[in-house]
Swiss-Prot record:
The modification O-acetylserine is found at S565. It is found in: Microsome membrane; Endoplasmic reticulum membrane; Nucleus inner membrane; Nucleus outer membrane. Its cofactor is heme b. Glycans are attached at N53, N130, N396, N580. The gene is Ptgs2. This is Prostaglandin G/H synthase 2. Homodimer. InterPro entries: EGF-like_dom (IPR000742), Haem_peroxidase_animal (IPR019791), Haem_peroxidase_sf (IPR010255), Haem_peroxidase_sf_animal (IPR037120), Oxylipin_biosynth_metab (IPR050783). The keyword Metal-binding applies. Residues 18-55 form the EGF-like domain. Keywords: Acetylation, Dioxygenase, Disulfide bond, Endoplasmic reticulum, Fatty acid biosynthesis, Fatty acid metabolism, Glycoprotein, Heme, Iron, Lipid biosynthesis, Lipid metabolism, Membrane, Metal-binding, Microsome, Nucleus, Oxidoreductase, Peroxidase, Prostaglandin biosynthesis, Prostaglandin metabolism, S-nitrosylation, Signal. It comes from Rattus norvegicus (Rat). GO terms for molecular function: enzyme binding; heme binding; metal ion binding; oxidoreductase activity, acting on single donors with incorporation of molecular oxygen; oxidoreductase activity, acting on single donors with incorporation of molecular oxygen, incorporation of two atoms of oxygen; peroxidase activity; prostaglandin-endoperoxide synthase activity; protein homodimerization activity. PANTHER family: PROSTAGLANDIN G/H SYNTHASE (PTHR11903), PROSTAGLANDIN G_H SYNTHASE 2 (PTHR11903:SF8).
Amino acid sequence: MLFRAVLLCAALALSHAANPCCSNPCQNRGECMSIGFDQYKCDCTRTGFYGENCTTPEFLTRIKLLLKPTPNTVHYILTHFKGVWNIVNNIPFLRNSIMRYVLTSRSHLIDSPPTYNVHYGYKSWEAFSNLSYYTRALPPVADDCPTPMGVKGNKELPDSKEVLEKVLLRREFIPDPQGTNMMFAFFAQHFTHQFFKTDQKRGPGFTRGLGHGVDLNHVYGETLDRQHKLRLFQDGKLKYQVIGGEVYPPTVKDTQVDMIYPPHVPEHLRFAVGQEVFGLVPGLMMYATIWLREHNRVCDILKQEHPEWDDERLFQTSRLILIGETIKIVIEDYVQHLSGYHFKLKFDPELLFNQQFQYQNRIASEFNTLYHWHPLLPDTFNIEDQEYTFKQFLYNNSILLEHGLAHFVESFTRQIAGRVAGGRNVPIAVQAVAKASIDQSREMKYQSLNEYRKRFSLKPYTSFEELTGEKEMAAELKALYHDIDAMELYPALLVEKPRPDAIFGETMVELGAPFSLKGLMGNPICSPQYWKPSTFGGEVGFRIINTASIQSLICNNVKGCPFASFNVQDPQPTKTATINASASHSRLDDINPTVLIKRRSTEL
């Protein structure tokens, strides 16, 4: 009888044994498949490795590994030797060859077609075809794994509030040594909200941004109904209003477009744009206004060039031109600034025409998560000689009208943003958003930091001190997580030691760049079928794209052509400004900004 009981217990134990793939035994992007309840097999197909766990390199792979420099070495070369890079930048053949390598080496790290999502940790038609899911770079940790990170770490992750308070929250503002400014910060927020549109009703693994890329739905609206409400249906233009001799977005009343505004916001300040959340802060409405003006400006140019075209063709072609302008500005101004490279990046779709490249994209939830750059935000916003708190800034379009776009551009170009990596720089005002980012990552069962580093060809960290580059935060993290292999992705990105004089650490760049460049160059307008003058109304439209920059965008649409850049030209200690005691029309004294932002989206 006792023997039977022992056998029964053993059988029950085996039936509840952990999934053998929980330990992530397959290396170098090999795929683990369970066989029975306690065996697994690694599929090493086309990885360049073989063996039980895909750890033995093939001959050509071994040579590539010997010759390939580390990401930090590449970064060092690209951010030093300025004289050499000045020569390279002026030799088209060399510049094109290097840019082609940058694009292909980065974008080939992204699976296309997509593979996994929050509910499918294996290949399935649902994971491929259902656009309402974010895709995944790594499958979720299986439900039957013994710990949240597979087999490493404790059975429970540390309290997210404790993680936030000990290593993420700001003690004092840490400016970005790379000189990133608020013009950049609000561009990032405005630009990414066309594809980071989490469906909060369905959960963090789902998106409402079904275009999965740069389609400018934040300008034109996600649905055809919203687009039609925003359109003038005359000369291809969008609706607008004129205030003080300048063009601004129309109101909610005039368009009947749904926007998110608290009840106290006056009717005349409820501007209506493509993204319903852009009334949150005037910095977002600034860019919404600039792109509205740009669309209507391009329509005027096309109308003059093609008087025979109807409203629909003028609208659709102008949209394609603005998509092209956006991609060019993002690569040549935005990514250029973030990289810190002396090599001059170039937007030229023809560089990929003879390469293996798929013109499609699917936004990954990890890309959404890593883009939560809340440390960029300052403690206050300086416009002209006035200083606004978070409370005064929220849902207060009156500030935009009071100061005007020119002063906004000038002020945000001068105001330095915060450093993202290095820890302890998340503003208290958005702590609820940062906490939600941790909680939602857990809900989506992200794998550990080191698993993501391996996925993107980086060496895993061996200690918390190696991660942070110092001892004090490393000790806090060790007490919280115990094992470096159990370190969560999102907090790790914010506490990772920054590269020298840089805004980010290694992991943020090496994970983010492939997602970014694949999404940009995978746009249909970059394909051989689209990338030709006739797509954009002829040479005139093509020239608008090929000469676009953040400075030209501002000059063409803001009075006085104020200087615009994504970095502070001469970083100075922040001067004391006059605190603006008035919230103007906003009446926000009784509003908690962290609650408001959390209710809207963790992406804001």
